[in-house]
Amino acid sequence: MTQAQAKRFQFDRQLWHRFVETAQPYFYPVGQKQTRVFLGLILALMVVVVALTLFLSMGLTLWATAIFPDFFAKSGEGLVDGVQGLINSPAPWIGLVALAMAGAVFISQRQKLQQRWLQWLLLGVLLSLLFVVNGLNVILSFVFRFIDTALNGKDAEVFWQFLWIYGIVIVVAIPIIVAYRYLRQKLGVLWRQWLTEHFLGRYFKGRSYYHLDSNSAYTLIDNPDQRITQDIQSFTGVTLDFLLDILDSILTLISFTAILYTISQTLMWGLIGYAVFGTVVAIAIGTRLIRINYEQLRLEANFRYGLVRVRDNAESIAFYRGEGLERKQVTDRLLGAIRNFNLLIIWQALISLFQLGYNYFTRLIPYIIIAPLYLAGDLDFGAIAQASLAFGMVLSALSLVTNQIQNITEFAASINRLGEFYESLNGPSNELERPESTGFDHNVITTRIGATVALENVTLSPPNSSRILVRDLSLAVAPGNHLLIMGPSGSGKSSLLRAIAGLWDSGQGTIERPELADLLFLPQRPYMILGTLREQLIYPSAQSIADDDFLLETLNKVNLPDLAERFGGLDSLENWSSVLSLGEQQRIALARVFINQPRYAILDEATSALDVNNEAELYHALTDLGTTFISVGHRPTLRNFHRQCLEVQAEGRWQISPINN
């Protein structure tokens, strides 16, 4: 593994940068120094939540004191005095000032937060509920302490009093916890939807999906489909979980450290040291796990893709009787995933060994420190249970990394996969994660929008290759001057069409063409979308551009008069690539030309599955339509429908000749 590759699997600044670039846009635009503003907004939101929680706590305490004065006089005197002291202190004024300042921060960013208020509102509600849940946990720790002390002292009145309080707290807590969990998942779903649409927008922009094709030798971005589906779902859910877990840990740490400090300072400091030790060891082990989890995601995706390929090419495999080879290839992918998974479970076992020892040993520490204090009469019996609870809560907060290291390493792997994907989508289309240069220095073919298709001194090469397909080619295809491109297989005929479409730009020279909306490309194997027959016909238009009569007339024109009736109408939904023969699919593709009526149609052996008579009828119909066509083909009969012929020869040579019909 190279040093650059090793850096992909470390807890470092690059990992943080990729995380921010992926996570921040949902809440705040990404830009120079914008991350600081984003983090400042989160801090301001926390200030708002803390201030509102403070006022709510004081108000509820005063309200409860007014309703149950006898109870608070006997059992909650310290609480009432503390709240009263808080009210008389500068704290309320500080809270009001903090609220005003935090509000001003959000108001100052209102333009950049447009259409983002819902996520901030949900996040604020979640933080508020998190504060409430932590407050209820603190209350329960004291309730348990009083219950245990009452049982030990056989004080029935206090026992039943606090048992009723426990019941009330549970009744209040259950709907709050349910609401918290629901909103947590809801925000995760909304975030996933937004982030997926954000990635899809970039994936389809500038034909990035083509340049990032995982079948290409020129990209290191494997399985973009998995990154958009599984990795984004994992990223949004786990990010939200970790964010709230970290905040929960901070609140728990503050709340229960104070309780622990009042019981035993020795216990508190020993706990902090123990947690730091566990975190350091967990991170050291986890760094190795990031790479293993990254590989597991990649290998599982490759295995799944192998099965998808078999499903999509079942008929071809059956004709070739290639079941044995296909099974071997799919099994090899499975074994690759299994080998890596075996390595993964070894490391997971090592982490589990450390985690179990770490967690079991922690149960001894409170008793070792607290028992002598109780036996000496310095603590009441209920303090033992409260100390154990507080110790466990604080340890859980401090040991977040230790206990979640396996999830964190899986999360880091997802961050790296999404980060690489995001960086590639933002890069120039001809620089998308390609391997190192082969040593052949390419220029770039220039594309110019014009009224015709014309090539000026075009030299074309495959991406990252020194092979010359066509050298210094100049030609013009004026309206009606149909062009036929012929030549031996592998000579570069289809590559020339890719250059005209703007898919390939390795080489030099200038290509003039109309806007892509005025061009329609028909490959040899037509693309059948997942949609109705109507949607097949109007593709690539998203909305219907013709009425039913015109669509049916077009089907008749391409010699498919009974197709709609055969499948139950234009709105029938089928797996068209399976139920239609290749010849029928090619005629559907030609129907798209008659429906969309482009100025130029480029046919890459688009009639190869048709008989000569069908081919002749369709070319005559295209001529009557007024669309200028550029065809790639091998049949000599194609010359009857074109005005000029470009013959692509070996070593970049070519010849243009007129066709006299």
Swiss-Prot record:
Pfam families linked to this entry: ABC_membrane_2, ABC_tran
GO annotations of cellular component type: plasma membrane
Residues in ABC transporter domain copies: 453-659
Keyword check for Amino-acid biosynthesis: no
InterPro entries found in the cross-reference section: AAA+_ATPase, ABC1_TM_dom, ABC1_TM_sf, ABC_transporter-like_ATP-bd, ABC_transporter-like_CS, ABC_transporter_sub-D, P-loop_NTPase
Domain of life: Bacteria
PROSITE patterns (alphabetical): ABC_TM1F, ABC_TRANSPORTER_1, ABC_TRANSPORTER_2
Positions bound to ATP: G487, P488, S489, G490, S491, G492, K493, S494
Compartments it resides in: Cell inner membrane
Keyword terms of this UniProt record: ATP-binding, Cell inner membrane, Cell membrane, Membrane, Nucleotide-binding, Transmembrane, Transmembrane helix, Transport
Molecular function per GO: ABC-type transporter activity; ATP binding; ATP hydrolysis activity
Bilayer topology: Multi-pass membrane protein
Coarse class of the protein's main subcellular location: membrane
Domain ABC transmembrane type-1: 123-410
Record field: transmembrane: 37-57, 87-107, 120-140, 158-178, 243-263, 266-286, 341-361
Family as reported in the entry's similarity comment: Belongs to the ABC transporter superfamily.
The protein, known as: Uncharacterized ABC transporter ATP-binding protein sll0182
Organism: Synechocystis sp. (strain ATCC 27184 / PCC 6803 / Kazusa)
